[in-house]
Amino acid sequence: VDDELSSNIKLLIEKYVDNDFDVSDYYTDDVITRINNLEISGYENLMQGFQAHHDVLYDNIIVEDLYVHTNYFTSGEIWSNAWFTWKGTGKTTGEEYTNRGHFDYKWEDGKIAILQAYYSEYAENKEAAAYTASQN
């Protein structure tokens, strides 16, 4: 779907893959991020997490099979939804990971106020544990 907000989500995902986190124009400062059952508050905390994917956890990050659409509800709420396959190679383990993901983005006044992410945390937990163990 090629509406402006869906295109913005595609751009944000491309920037994530490219390790480009100069995206503050797209998020509120106090964006709430929910990753499965974990809640993170604030733009800076969200970007630090994304940046750690590139700096600490993974090499060769790619996103495939991306589909995005945006829903405009009669209540006035606007949500963009993205489905994709994320792939990366663990920096510490060397293991190649493939992970299906689904992200929901709530727009308020032209910016993302809520990001909800649903995916298996297996790769992240395994790489984080391996990285932590390698630092001791």
Task: Please annotate each region the language model reported.
Residues V1-D18, Q135-N136:
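Short, low-complexity N-terminal intrinsically disordered segments enriched in polar/charged residues
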Residues W83-K111:
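Exposed beta-sheet edge and beta->alpha loop/turn motif
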Residues D20-Y72:
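A solvent-exposed, acidic/Ser-Thr-rich amphipathic alpha-helical stretch
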Residues D25-Y26, G76-E77, Y105-A113:
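Short, solvent-exposed coil/turn segments at beta-strand boundaries
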Residues I114-N136:
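Low-complexity, intrinsically disordered terminal/linker segments enriched in charged
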